[in-house]
Curated annotation (Swiss-Prot):
Role description: Required for the formation of a threonylcarbamoyl group on adenosine at position 37 (t(6)A37) in tRNAs that read codons beginning with adenine. Is involved in the transfer of the threonylcarbamoyl moiety of threonylcarbamoyl-AMP (TC-AMP) to the N6 group of A37, together with TsaE and TsaB. TsaD likely plays a direct catalytic role in this reaction.
Cofactor note as given: Binds 1 Fe(2+) ion per subunit.
SUPFAM superfamilies to which the protein is assigned, alphabetical: Actin-like ATPase domain
Top-level taxonomy: Bacteria, Pseudomonadati, Campylobacterota, Epsilonproteobacteria, Campylobacterales
Residues given in the record as substrate binding sites: 129-133, 162, 175, 265
Cofactor or coenzyme needed: Fe(2+)
Residues passing through the membrane, by range: none
An annotated GO cellular component: cytoplasm
Protein name in UniProt: tRNA N6-adenosine threonylcarbamoyltransferase
Length: 325
């Protein structure tokens, strides 16, 4: 068994995964959304303090598994440095106390493996990662062979939802709030421009769209917000679809996956499903409960790393807020 810890942002989570079967034996997550919502976003120091309170409480529930643990895994990158440290400090203590190896896991690779929680993995895949911190397309051959072929030049897909929600004083996180509001709105009322539409670049950019929405919000009444939300969600998604169309002309998709917290957006999911139909490509999706940050996905990567004896050095293991894959 492997115990895995996730604390890269505002979710405190611990999981226990069986190595031989990939079975998830335990998983608990304590979200900090309520505490951060009053600030309109994550406050790093508050997040770290809440992790320091929540992680030990969850760990107490894992006592029955301690005697059977073969390794401890923890997210080390990317994320908020002050919150990553909380998880790594706990993982190091467990490693020393139980005399078991420690495995440092890349959070982004974890999101890819959210597709395979309690399942066997299979590759190659073309993966779209959409979250609060990242928007990128990757060609994935294994957990060690990942090539990024397109990424955001500024704001991410998920981050833009958070910022638009903040403009409307709708709280945090913005993704679910904007998605719910958009369902009752007119997607074509506001003619926002699709970012980088004329550009040959296969890349993403949300800063310009965000500014256009800000101007619309400032000129609107509250009853207009649902139409703004719907129009924004439509264009934010159309931007991804347009760039994927360009990429698919160069590299036709065979098996395509969407991962990350913002992959829970049902409009994005259905739009990509329609895009893939002419290609006859398979679409892989994480279960909705595993789209956001969780320790089960970290444990699933760690199982693969354990089998390859890819352990971290306890004395030199450090956090890295920024990571590129």
């Amino acid at each position: 068994m492997i115990l895995s810890i996730e604390s890269s942002c505002d979710d405190s989570a611990i999981a226990i995964t069986e190595i031989a079967t990939n079975r998830l034996l335990f998983h608990k997550k304590i979200s900090q959304e309520l505490e951060h919502s009053v600030y309109g976003g994550v406050v790093p120091e508050l997040a770290a303090r809440l992790h320091a309170e929540a992680l030990p409480r969850i760990l107490e529930e894992c006592n029955p598994y301690f005697k059977d643990l073969k390794a401890v895994a923890v997210t080390t990158t990317p994320g908020l440095s002050v919150t990553l440290v909380e998880g790594v400090t706990m993982a190091k203590a467990i490693s020393i106390a139980l005399n078991i190896p420690i495995i440092g896991v890349n959070h982004l690779v974890g999101h890819i493996y959210s597709l395979f929680i309690e399942k066997e993995s299979y590759f190659p895949l073309t993966v779209l990662l959409v979250s609060g911190g990242h928007t990128q397309v990757m060609e994935v051959k294994s957990f060690t062979e990942i090539k990024t072929v397109a990424k955001s030049m500024d704001d991410s897909f998920g981050e833009s939802f958070d910022k638009v929600a903040k403009m409307m004083n709708l709280g945090y996180p913005g993704g679910p709030v904007i998605e719910a509001l958009a369902k009752g709105g007119d997607r074509k009322r506001y003619n926002f421009t699709v970012p980088l539409f004329q550009s040959p670049l296969i890349a993403f950019s949300y800063s310009g769209l965000k500014n256009s929405v800000r101007l619309a919000v400032e000129a609107a009444n509250e009853e207009d917000f649902k139409d703004i939300a719907a129009s924004f969600e439509h264009i934010a998604t159309a931007h991804i679809i347009q760039k994927l169309k360009k990429y698919f002309k160069e590299v036709p998709p065979k098996t395509f996956a969407i991962v990350g917290g913002a992959s829970a957006n049902l409009y994005l999911r259905s739009s990509i499903e329609e895009l893939l139909k002419p290609h006859g490509a398979d679409l892989l999706l994480s279960e909705l409960k595993y789209c956001s940050d969780n320790a089960a996905m970290i444990g699933r990567v760690a199982v693969e790393m354990y089998k390859e004896s890819l352990f971290s050095d306890l004395s030199s293991l450090e956090v890295c807020p920024k990571s590129v894959i």
